[in-house]
């Protein structure tokens, strides 16, 4: 959520910056609502003051033995007017809040302005794509040839966009996640967390999945009088970041760096027809997530570090990649600046996204009321939150199968994964 004071005082500037993201802010309507809010706020306060003043006179009139029926009627009339104004004010505030919750984050000034992914800017490349002297197979043919990827039974058990992994391919998939966690916890200083795969609506509102992206979630339990509805997590960013919701942490505790390996669940409502085959776009997939919670002045440096942590995974695995900075029109809803890391997939002869690393600044923190106590003045201030994939496990498996394939359909195991594979150097 954007800063309400900045929004009120810099409405034109806000509208211009949001327009670079393709979000059109109705300035006239918002201005009208703000004027109505001010009038109702003043009217409510005046009615409250009048009722309080007249209410005090009732006791004085009674003490003098006077009839207070007329005064009581006046207090009742003021009370009715006050209740009506409060209802009107609440309706205006609810509409303003709905608009505020629908607004994406303001893009950082360093984010390139552009309409879509074609205007993202490449910042670096690492590694050289391998030249093959035999026909390249894609990960589907390779995985099925190893009896390790079973799409047919996944469809029978559940439906499309799910997978059953077996044998050494399943073991390799597990090894990838374990390697990532060890790298981030041992070398990069993250604390591993085990988190719920089901989260409530307050958590999803806090990190920005609700209300805008409700259709992309798997809802398992509707809201009732007894409690909030529950949904499967689309990313571990949700439970990890919400650990500081409604909290004030000490400045000395910062930065907080957390990582988790979880299953993630997405309906992919807006991606009909895209990547319908294989592991690239699944309803259920594993991901190792990194989250950093930092002081505002540290968040841009933290974004560079977090992106570097994701890149290190690919470097250790020997997988060629490129890093791009997303333009304003391609950034995620809550992000102010995002780097996408794209891994080379030989069968597609292109780079595909394997990690997205974002600085949310105080956008999520304001929604969550996540703050820290500033040592200098002992006052609370909003935190900055960051998140990134470190990495998507399934897509990493795809990249390893395709980049490390051999002419006979076997797969060479990257050296860093061999300790997790019982010393195996290849499968198949």
UniProtKB/Swiss-Prot annotation:
Q: What superkingdom heads the lineage?
A: Bacteria
> What pathway is this protein a component of?
Aminoacyl-tRNA biosynthesis; selenocysteinyl-tRNA(Sec) biosynthesis; L-seryl-tRNA(Sec) from L-serine and tRNA(Sec): step 1/1
Which BP terms in the Gene Ontology apply to this protein?
A: selenocysteine biosynthetic process; seryl-tRNA aminoacylation
The entry's localization annotation reads: Cytoplasm
Chain positions recorded as L-serine binding sites: 235-237, 289, 389
* Residues that, per the record, bind ATP: 266-268, 353-356
Q: Which UniProt keywords apply?
A: Aminoacyl-tRNA synthetase, ATP-binding, Cytoplasm, Ligase, Nucleotide-binding, Protein biosynthesis
The protein's predominant localisation is cytoplasm
Give the EC number: 6.1.1.11
GO MF annotation terms: ATP binding; serine-tRNA ligase activity
Reactions performed catalytically: tRNA(Ser) + L-serine + ATP = L-seryl-tRNA(Ser) + AMP + diphosphate + H(+); tRNA(Sec) + L-serine + ATP = L-seryl-tRNA(Sec) + AMP + diphosphate + H(+)
Decide whether keyword Transmembrane is in the record: no
Quaternary structure, per UniProt, is:
Homodimer. The tRNA molecule binds across the dimer.
Q: What domain notes does the record hold?
A: Consists of two distinct domains, a catalytic core and a N-terminal extension that is involved in tRNA binding.
Can you tell me which family this protein belongs to?
Belongs to the class-II aminoacyl-tRNA synthetase family. Type-1 seryl-tRNA synthetase subfamily.
Function, in words: Catalyzes the attachment of serine to tRNA(Ser). Is also able to aminoacylate tRNA(Sec) with serine, to form the misacylated tRNA L-seryl-tRNA(Sec), which will be further converted into selenocysteinyl-tRNA(Sec).
Name this polypeptide is given: Serine--tRNA ligase
The gene it comes from is serS
